[in-house]
Amino acid sequence: MSTVTITDLARENVRNLTPYQSARRLGGNGDVWLNANEYPTAVEFQLTQQTLNRYPECQPKAVIENYAQYAGVKPEQVLVSRGADEGIELLIRAFCEPGKDSILYCPPTYGMYSVSAETIGVECRTVPTLDNWQLDLQGISDKLDGVKVVYVCSPNNPTGQLINPQDFRTLLELTRGKAIVVADEAYIEFCPQASLAGWLTEYPHLAILRTLSKAFALAGLRCGFTLANEEVINLLMKVIAPYPLSTPVADIAAQALSPQGIVAMRERVAQIIAEREYLIAALKEIPCVEQVFDSETNYILARFKASSAVFKSLWDQGIILRDQNKQPSLSGCLRITVGTREESQRVIDALRAEQV
């Protein structure tokens, strides 16, 4: 009689799953962490809620109302979750039948769309972006049959550019009555004029993902949002955990979304954008850098002459970047988070010392 192992008992798709390689999971012993698009310094908050003996609200009122006011939507159009990553998964769980429906996304892009779908047993379809990293609308149209959720990251991680708004409109018309279109706006604070939040009334099948991890400098808090019409939010409420936000998380999130919290966030954004432009200008003058791509975010994508050697050399010096070589159309590319001026200078000096 053959022995059944614990792994044998697991679902086949989980046995075969490659987990998302987060920046922390990839490790490294650096002192300059520029691989996770975090804000470089900690923001201090004081906990005001001491009722830790009680379960929290499922959707904390202060957080929802503050975020709705900030985003320019109604409170009924906001769902708060454990990071935007939970929002990605909730949309698949609410709208996709495992073994029947599919999601669609456009690489090179964020890796959690596929991991969430594969974990649940939902097929992934990909339509690579065009050479300018814009949507291949014809390719998407050809693959839409059976697709229930389409994920589009804008500005796109890791390329840093915005998706053409007219292409978004075309996609929303293509999918009307067929699929949910999810605009992942994790980095929208760095280009707020490009948000699609004002489109929700026009498109009942539009959902928007947001986070406090980037411009709000709260990656350790794990707090994200889904903006959508009330019908979508009500469906997501059926599949979300009963207490997604702990009391301390809700407490800090509400403070971060207060009027003074929003002002502080915008000051951070202005500082990061200024630092980004400084770093882009410096990178363009460095011999081992082949190309620096424009960015609307808090990170820069650049192509290097010997990216693997450069990545390892900086890693050995304690400067941790994100290797994008395995992504479609990104051979030779590394992604650099915009940090402090001191961190930028460390990167610049290390790259200038590279042999070409």
Curated annotation (Swiss-Prot):
Protein name per UniProt: Histidinol-phosphate aminotransferase
Domain of life: Bacteria
Ranges that cross the membrane: none
Disulphide bridges, residue numbers: none
EC number: 2.6.1.9
Catalytic activity: L-histidinol phosphate + 2-oxoglutarate = 3-(imidazol-4-yl)-2-oxopropyl phosphate + L-glutamate
Positions where N6-(pyridoxal phosphate)lysine occurs in the chain: K214
Pathway info: Amino-acid biosynthesis; L-histidine biosynthesis; L-histidine from 5-phospho-alpha-D-ribose 1-diphosphate: step 7/9
Pfam family for this entry, one: Aminotran_1_2
GO biological process terms, semicolon-separated: L-histidine biosynthetic process
Keywords annotated in UniProt: Amino-acid biosynthesis, Aminotransferase, Histidine biosynthesis, Pyridoxal phosphate, Transferase
Cofactors required: pyridoxal 5'-phosphate
Quaternary structure annotation from Swiss-Prot or TrEMBL: Homodimer.
GO MF term set: histidinol-phosphate transaminase activity; pyridoxal phosphate binding
Entry-linked PROSITE patterns: AA_TRANSFER_CLASS_2
UniProt family annotation: Belongs to the class-II pyridoxal-phosphate-dependent aminotransferase family. Histidinol-phosphate aminotransferase subfamily.
Gene name per UniProt: hisC
